[in-house]
């Protein structure tokens, strides 16, 4: 994507001349939407990011959150939507590789991956091809570098048939004294380590800053190629190199162009780079191509001349190719050389930030919720439970190695969030979960984004975690489309409101624009990943019950079926408003779960598919039936279908000898039975239920 006429004029005016080919390439990459956030950063600054436990927030490759004395967690989310649409395998694999390298930049050990995936209907051949290969790419890369994929979420929606939303989150831990010190001074060296530069991924950031067309093959060259073997070498290298370096940076989107510009800006120093010194896999490359190549599995290390030998020794030990490509200066300019000749000389003040570009906004009104007839309840329950969105996702996560690293306490499907043991601090654990609901954010972007936040918050709370911090990913269409830009702005406001109300700072995130196919934008998708601390992993809650347990519902069900799975699956409607949020109730819910820690057999959040889906999932996961009087659940609705399928917030199910909330029945036997008083409204064998709720892909 070319620079805009206004941007070109700004560059010419500042330089007093035409930019050189290499300078133009730098601006084209670094000022792309993908790298510069020029259309979004003025809004993202509104998000709360500070708290006493936040050591480092947004602005660098990875944040740091203190989880225990002298121990930090880091987590980061990344989107790889455009590459995954064109080359699903490599698009997904390189997304995983890139997010792992972000975590490495703070010296952390990557301990887990989560994926939030949004595909077209599994019955559609093209959507299925994308889904199968995205899953394969994630699995192959994660398994080969030894980082477990421990959880996530998968959505199916017609809008994602040709334009998937593929999000990867990596979690890492690092001791306080293991974080590179940061800082740089004139004379410090810039080293590029990893694969040799080649033409794979050329223009990747510009590619991610435009919409997709039917001629996707022409963009294949903009998709990077993954190399998990080198990715594993970089993980091992960073583990030992922390004492040899001052600063580490991923060499990702925008290539060396963005890396050099960001390093110069962070340290407010000039840079001199000799582009011909970089090691190349393709010796036919010119300086502009070297500068903007997005070859994967590469990192930048900043070190002092006195520590160079220390770093070189480790690079050779792990057989990682490297080049000394530049140094910092006091001049405040970015100088680029090729075979001794200056091919670019730019003031840092011009390079650092693309001019902000706000766009017009245009609100829209979603379809109001019409009166819908009450359907045959048994058929409606079967329809909701068999929905690909509600179904168990074994067909996906069984392809992942979720046990490698032996930290996984709650595996995919066992609870509402993944739980990881932090052996470095006894029984301490981390709980982490990502959530999104594209229907909610279509109907009301602000309330939908807040719902994504509260759902992830509640999932972490229900397994026994204390939510600490969040990262987000906002995925919408072209910012030049007023309705899409309005969706983005409203989503930011929803995230801000939720973060402030819950006291959970947003420490990082990712915005992906231009998610369109043939001029049609996807449903706006806002994913939120919440990370929390579990004080004792032996007391976490699985989403199960045992024979003889009482079953309890905490929280009130309201007439809230707007945007629900029930409304879509049974009535074919996407209409109304997402569920309302009472943040005081959500915080009370989190406190109640922690109060009951170690005394429950299990617990589960009530969300997608309502009480019917949550109760059925606990039965199927346990392999044990239950007899539930659904009409005993606290509610303000007079309709049985709304009671069963409302997706009201502020609710969870508990199982145990005793439990919080209202007792609605007991677990036991081979049948899952729902009744209203003496009237049975649904009855199925548990083994039939498990089959009904299994995803086929």
Swiss-Prot record:
Active site (catalytic residues): 34, 80 (proton acceptor)
Record-level GO cellular component terms: cytoplasm
SUPFAM superfamilies (alphabetical): PurM C-terminal domain-like, PurM N-terminal domain-like
Binding-site positions, substrate: 79-82, 101, 224, 294-296, 512
A Pfam family per the record: FGAR-AT_linker
Positions in coiled-coil regions: none
Record GO terms (molecular function): ATP binding; magnesium ion binding; phosphoribosylformylglycinamidine synthase activity
Entry binding sites for ATP: 37, 76, 472, 509
CDD domains: PurL_repeat1 (cd02203), PurL_repeat2 (cd02204)
Catalytic reaction equation(s): N(2)-formyl-N(1)-(5-phospho-beta-D-ribosyl)glycinamide + L-glutamine + ATP + H2O = 2-formamido-N(1)-(5-O-phospho-beta-D-ribosyl)acetamidine + L-glutamate + ADP + phosphate + H(+)
Pathway annotation: Purine metabolism; IMP biosynthesis via de novo pathway; 5-amino-1-(5-phospho-D-ribosyl)imidazole from N(2)-formyl-N(1)-(5-phospho-D-ribosyl)glycinamide: step 1/2
Protein location: Cytoplasm
Positions with a binding annotation for Mg(2+) 2: 102, 250
UniProt keyword list: ATP-binding, Cytoplasm, Ligase, Magnesium, Metal-binding, Nucleotide-binding, Purine biosynthesis
Residue numbers binding Mg(2+) 1: 78
EC number: 6.3.5.3
GO annotation (BP), single: purine nucleotide biosynthetic process
InterPro entries: PRibForGlyAmidine_synth_PurL, PurL_linker, PurM-like_C_dom, PurM-like_C_sf, PurM-like_N, PurM-like_N_sf
Complexes and interactors: Monomer. Part of the FGAM synthase complex composed of 1 PurL, 1 PurQ and 2 PurS subunits.
Xref: NCBIfam families: FGAM_synth_II, PRK01213.1
Purpose of the protein: Part of the phosphoribosylformylglycinamidine synthase complex involved in the purines biosynthetic pathway. Catalyzes the ATP-dependent conversion of formylglycinamide ribonucleotide (FGAR) and glutamine to yield formylglycinamidine ribonucleotide (FGAM) and glutamate. The FGAM synthase complex is composed of three subunits. PurQ produces an ammonia molecule by converting glutamine to glutamate. PurL transfers the ammonia molecule to FGAR to form FGAM in an ATP-dependent manner.
Record family assignment: Belongs to the FGAMS family.
Name recorded for this polypeptide: Phosphoribosylformylglycinamidine synthase subunit PurL
Organism listed in the record: Pyrobaculum aerophilum (strain ATCC 51768 / DSM 7523 / JCM 9630 / CIP 104966 / NBRC 100827 / IM2)
């Amino acid at each position: 994507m070319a620079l805009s006429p206004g941007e070109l004029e700004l560059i010419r005016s500042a330089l007093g001349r035409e930019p050189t080919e290499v300078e133009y390439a730098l601006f084209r990459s670094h000022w792309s939407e993908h790298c510069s956030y020029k259309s979004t950063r003025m809004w993202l600054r509104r998000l709360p990011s500070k708290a006493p436990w936040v050591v480092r927030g947004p602005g660098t490759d990875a944040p740091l959150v203190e989880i225990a004395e002298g121990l930090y967690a880091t987590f980061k989310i990344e989107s790889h939507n455009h590459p995954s649409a064109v080359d699903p395998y490599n698009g997904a694999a390189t997304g995983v590789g890139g997010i792992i390298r972000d975590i490495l930049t703070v010296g952390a050990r990557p301990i887990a991956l989560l994926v939030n995936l949004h595909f077209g209907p599994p019955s559609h051949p093209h959507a299925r091809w994308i889904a199968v290969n995205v899953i394969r790419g994630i699995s192959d890369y994660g398994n080969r570098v030894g980082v477990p994929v421990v959880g996530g979420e998968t959505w199916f929606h017609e809008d994602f048939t040709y334009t998937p939303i593929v999000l990867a989150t990596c979690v890492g831990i690092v001791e306080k004294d293991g974080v590179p010190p940061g800082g740089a001074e004139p004379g410090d060296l810039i080293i590029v380590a990893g694969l040799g530069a080649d033409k794979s991924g050329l223009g990747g950031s510009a590619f991610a800053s435009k919409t997709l067309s039917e001629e996707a093959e022409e963009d294949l060259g903009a998709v990077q190629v993954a190399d998990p073997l080198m990715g594993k070498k970089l993980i091992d290298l960073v583990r030992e190199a922390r004492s040899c370096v001052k600063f580490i940076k991923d060499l990702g989107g925008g290539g060396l162009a963005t890396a050099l510009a960001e390093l110069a800006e962070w340290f407010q120093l000039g840079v001199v780079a000799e582009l011909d010194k970089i090691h190349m896999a393709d010796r036919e490359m010119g300086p502009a191509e070297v500068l903007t190549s997005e070859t994967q599995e590469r990192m930048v290390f900043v070190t002092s001349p006195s520590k160079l030998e220390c770093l070189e020794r480790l690079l050779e030990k792990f057989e990682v190719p490297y080049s000394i490509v530049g140094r910092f200066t006091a001049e405040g300019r970015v100088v680029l050389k090729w075979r001794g000749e200056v091919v670019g000389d730019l003031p840092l003040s011009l390079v650092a930030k693309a001019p902000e570009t706000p766009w017009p906004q245009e609100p829209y009104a979603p379809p109001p919720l019409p009166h819908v007839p009450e359907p045959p309840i048994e058929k409606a329950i079967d329809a909701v439970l068999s929905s690909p969105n509600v179904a168990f996702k074994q067909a996906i996560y069984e392809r992942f190695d979720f046990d490698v690293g032996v930290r996984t306490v709650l595996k995919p499907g066992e609870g509402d969030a993944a739980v990881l043991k932090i052996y470095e601090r006894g029984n301490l654990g981390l709980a982490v979960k990502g959530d999104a609901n594209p229907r909610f954010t279509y109907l009301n972007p602000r309330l939908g984004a807040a719902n994504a936040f509260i759902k992830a918050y509640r999932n972490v709370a229900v397994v026994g975690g204390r939510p600490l911090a969040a990262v987000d990913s906002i995925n919408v269409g072209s910012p030049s489309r007023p309705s899409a830009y309005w969706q983005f702005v409203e989503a930011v406001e929803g995230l801000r409101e939720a973060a402030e109300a819950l006291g959970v700072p947003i420490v990082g995130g990712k915005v992906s624009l231009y998610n369109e196919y043939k001029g049609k934008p996807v449903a706006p998708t806002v994913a939120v990943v919440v990370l929390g601390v579990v004080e004792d992993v032996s007391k976490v809650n699985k989403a199960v019950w045992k024979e003889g347990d009482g079953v309890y519902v905490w929280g009130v069900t309201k007439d809230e079926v707007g945007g629900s799975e029930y409304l879509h699956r049974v009535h074919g409607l996407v209409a109304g408003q997402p569920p309302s949020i009472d943040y005081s109730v959500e915080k009370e819910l989190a406190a109640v779960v922690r109060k009951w820690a170690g005394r429950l057999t299990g617990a589960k959040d009530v969300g997608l598919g309502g009480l019917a889906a949550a109760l059925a999932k606990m039965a199927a996961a346990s392999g044990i039936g239950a007899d539930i009087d659904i009409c005993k659940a606290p509610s303000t609705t007079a309709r049985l279908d709304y009671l069963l399928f409302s997706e009201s917030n502020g609710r969870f199910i508990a199982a145990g000898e005793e439990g919080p909330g209202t007792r609605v029945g007991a677990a036991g036997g081979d049948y899952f039975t729902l009744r209203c008083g003496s009237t049975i409204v649904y009855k199925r064998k548990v083994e039939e239920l498990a089959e009904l709720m299994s995803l086929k892909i």
